[in-house]
């Protein structure tokens, strides 16, 4: 019985970890000021690719940096 309860809790935790919310803080870099939408796209892209080197600062092709805060829900 204990095993069943632990298994259910673990399964629920794994299901919730599939949903991640990306919040960002744009940072100025190289005379460019990215929008929140551009940062979200850059951060989400880095997160989806599992590129941990680009988190928390996701660098994209337009040469700007964004602070990415990944919160799992």
Curated annotation (Swiss-Prot):
Protein modification: Contains 2 disulfide bonds.
Keywords, sorted A to Z: Disulfide bond, Secreted, Signal, Toxin
Compartment list: Secreted
Keyword Secreted carried by entry: yes
Example GO molecular function: toxin activity
Tissue: Expressed by the venom gland.
GO cellular component terms, semicolon-separated: extracellular region
Signal peptide segment: 1-20
Family: Belongs to the scoloptoxin-15 family.
Protein name: U-scoloptoxin(15)-Sa1a
Species the sequence originates in: Scolopendra alternans
């Amino acid at each position: 019985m204990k095993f069943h309860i632990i298994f259910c809790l673990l399964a629920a935790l794994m299901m919730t970890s599939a949903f991640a919310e990306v919040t960002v803080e744009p940072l100025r870099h190289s005379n460019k000021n990215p929008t929140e939408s551009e940062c979200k796209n850059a951060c989400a892209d880095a997160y989806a690719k599992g590129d941990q080197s680009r988190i928390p600062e996701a660098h994209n092709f337009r040469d700007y940096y964004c602070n990415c805060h990944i919160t799992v829900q």
